[in-house]
């Protein structure tokens, strides 16, 4: 294998990435101008990550007239447009800004200086920040003059952001003040604001204020003073300031709760002429037309008459009502009671939304598979029409029902079959989704849900693959989904049933089954019925020191068939028994112009009893725009299974591969390239690597020649696939159009030679021809894949 062409391309990419060219446009005439700033941070108790974060922070404190605006493009081009004529006064302002910013980090002895290189008209300024020692918190206490406020603060002191022997920072102080404001508002003090609190500090050195005639005591105090200069400390106390409006520190209770269930903007609260009013134990309900039942409000409004006002219940009520989807806008007004100084009335104004929503859409696709779950898809041009009707309020209980009708056709382009039929397949499907905004109390307690809903999903579909087969499908899902107190999403499907009936099999399809025996164990009439569990959690850290955001997500899916509901004697001859599990982990660090994204996926399906493989609609597959991008959809695996030889008309090629086990990991480096249309379209790029494969868990044919498709740990390294490539992303803000060019570097089908490592034979001279020429289809079939997708792959 000749690796030289590929090595040349890789070397060129590394060489270009190490070189930069700076272009300066519209520079000032006959004046020195600023082309760059350098910032050096000396000292300070920072680790490597914190030091880099501080340097980024200091850069943001440059005065506007000291900033150099650089536009990067294609890794190597840097453009400076209209550089500013250099003025030393702006550098002085920048140095003062940086010194002040260090105070916010607890470095009150920090010093900032600057020097400039003016040897020619291109000026570079170097800022030197000497951090010194941070001022540490010696003690911290609350001095709130109102006993109840003092008690609330002390009860939650363990949650304080002000910690002993840590630097006193502006961020920590503001966070502590905001935390206490929330605590007070959750205990009846709804008018309390941050303006009523002040953080005070005392850093007095005793040696400078204590008078003594004892020389030994004087030496001790002087030594203490020197130590405090070397390791400065501060004593903090949080005081309450008496506000001009004394009611700001009053505690309030809820008097009456008014619900205006079909509020109109021109309604006058005191005018009830054309309003129906009903009084319940906790609410006063007013409406022009009764849209909802009373128990719906009791379940979703968590505040009650006579309760202490709590801010968290205020927002929880808004979120609960918003989640129902019945109202266009939701507003809760707080009105102080004139007769009782410590009472407030709540007026909940609910502006109704449209009860019915009708939507329609037309989809156009060019894909390796059909738009349905059916098998045997080729490279097809598809058209699909979708119609949707949603009723948001059934039975006056905010129960929503959505009807979806889909009709589609796939046109044969002749690239994967020599059939002369224009229409390759057609489909028709109907789904009905019912969402009920309530779940059983036992489920709430079991999973500690804070919000949740029940669902009933039903579907029926018909797909006709001309000259191959027909497929009818039925599915039913009943269960619950909700968000836990830790913001984890858990979905339980207590009934998870799918029935796929394969019939009208043509002679052509039967020949395919004979030529590919493994298909018989996947493509057949199947009935699955059981339960399923889905778990998802997302952790976002918007305050990561070196990035705009940092996000981790974890998903787990588990389902079974034949162990619970499957014990019922229904459709025994078609019933499939299995357990299927998969986990997915994603990690993304986003910076201003770049991002790194990582994904890991593992899934396994275990056939039970006499079954040898999962049903085809439950199996795993790899390839395509969101998986192993070096292979087409369902184009990689199983194990080390060989590629079917290429033929000019692709006659008899069937390369769809699905399996019971999938392992995959992906990593992608994303970066901005250029703005095509400001504030509308941005061109971005991404370099990526995909690693993975699929396998069978058994050898269903009991044929030793097919053992290469079976998963075995000893063959894992040999049979793993690897592809790498580069893609472009056209970011339209509301969606991302993605194109990826991916090459195969490790091929499972060649695992018996060099463990599958084989770089694609491509060089500078023939790269364009091999990627785009019609005469190189066989080369692309064996080495390369081009995909188009919407939004990011993971």
Task: Indicate residue ranges for each PLM-predicted region.
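Short beta-strand elements
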Residues: 108-115, 190-199, 328-335, 489-497, ...
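Gram-negative/organellar outer-membrane beta-barrel architecture
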Residues: 149-152, 290-291, 310-558, 629-630, ...
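Interaction-mediating elements
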Residues: 20-323
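Bacterial Sec-dependent N-terminal signal peptides
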Residues: 1-36, 183, 600, 782-786, ...
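Flexible glycine-/small-residue-rich
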Residues: 23, 43, 129-133, 144-146, ...
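C-terminal outer-membrane beta-barrel translocator/porin domains of Gram-negative envelope proteins
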Residues: 362-378, 390, 493-682, 687-717, ...
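Conserved active-site loop/cleft motifs that coordinate metal ions or position small ligands
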Residues: 686-688, 736-742
